[in-house]
Amino acid sequence: MTAPRTLYDKIWDDHVVDVGPDGSALLYIDRHLVHEVTSPQAFEGLRVAGRKVHAPHKTLAVVDHNVQTSDRSKGIEDPESRTQLEALAENVRDFGIEFYDALDRRQGIVHIIGPEQGFTLPGQTIVCGDSHTSTHGAFGALAHGIGTSEVEHVLATQTLIQRKAKNMRVTVDGTLPPGVSAKDIVLAIIGEIGTAGGTGHVIEYAGEAIRALSMEGRMTICNMSIEGGARAGMVAPDEITYAYVKDRPKAPKGAAFDAARRYWESLVSDEGAQFDREIRLDAANLPPLVSWGTSPEDIVSILGTVPDPAQIADENKRQSKEKALAYMGLTPGMRMTDITLDRVFIGSCTNGRIEDLRIVAKMVEGRKVHDGVSAMVVPGSGLVKAQAEAEGIDRILKDAGFDWREPGCSMCLGMNPDKLRPGERCASTSNRNFEGRQGPRGRTHLVSPAMAAAAAVAGRFVDIREWRG
């Protein structure tokens, strides 16, 4: 009798081509996503070796990191960014890969366009030269980031040499209170386990609160698995998954969809399957959260205060948190609701989907962005932007004083014109608050879309459970 297996075990086993004497496995890769930053050297390696792309139809390319989110008719000003975009256009043409350029209405952030095109499906192995590839695990896929040399290996062979990770399960039961979202769940998880807590593991997210989430919410949680140190994050597929996937452009159709669904329904962890680590959270006890430091583990309730590093026993950790406070310009004991803001950024592969934008529009309709705040909303893709405009969301946001942009990674990272100026403080719906992440000496606070929207109007962080504008 076969031993009970986890969701991760099942997908891994289904994709092992061969196992080496050292225990490493040659893993078949179903889907490969590429963008302009981590792919140029990989394609050049193929040229030098005289190789072709093994399965061009299993790779999808898009520009996202370097594209400007303002007027695109002027082109890219930064020469290095322009070179990377031009290189990707040339590479996909030479190797026969489907490509969404900056003017394609399907263009967007790589981890948003994959799911919305139906390129991402349950049970697949999915890789990309980007750490937030874990996003696709929301569909019950094994998805993780890879390095540039591995990008070349996948292009050439459609395989990767991997070592199997350990299994970890995070169970979130209960019902989320009003004003608390998927972003708060994943920030709470990272706050609980730390940024190294998932190291060497693939996390399966389970429980009543996870099952109640939309696909957008599940993608938000899986997106930040890497911030918890995990190799990947996964949610078992269910009716919500199937409904999202069905009729997507690249999803199976008709009898092929029915056959695929029968397989997808087997993608659940068996009763009695063993996990190397288990974590449990009660969703009912979660408040809206805000990050205060320079690590995603530095989180606190909106009604909390900036912690005092002097209370930390470990000297190295204490010094690290003292450095974070100095960088952020905060003092121990300061109330989070007293922190004022210069900028608000709503977007990214964490929170740039239509559900996120609907939440923001609902929060700010009939209100105005605070005089001292510059706020921008960047849709995650051209299709998200078009849907938002069809619903009138853009009008609501622009009337409130938000800058409505073209799709791209934007201010999530300082690789394009959307950057913080030194010393500026930003409420951001993105996934990382490292030093300089959004621009040199910029200060980033991670929050949910609703929290960011309210902060834009109030000019400071507020408890959205009680906020009325």
Curated annotation (Swiss-Prot):
EC number(s) per entry: 4.2.1.33
Catalysis: reaction(s): (2R,3S)-3-isopropylmalate = (2S)-2-isopropylmalate
Domain of life: Bacteria
Top EC class, one word: lyase
Binding site for [4Fe-4S] cluster: 349, 409, 412
Keyword field contains Amino-acid biosynthesis: yes
Subunit architecture: Heterodimer of LeuC and LeuD.
Protein name as catalogued: 3-isopropylmalate dehydratase large subunit
Organism: Methylorubrum populi (strain ATCC BAA-705 / NCIMB 13946 / BJ001)
Upper taxonomic lineage: Bacteria, Pseudomonadati, Pseudomonadota, Alphaproteobacteria, Hyphomicrobiales
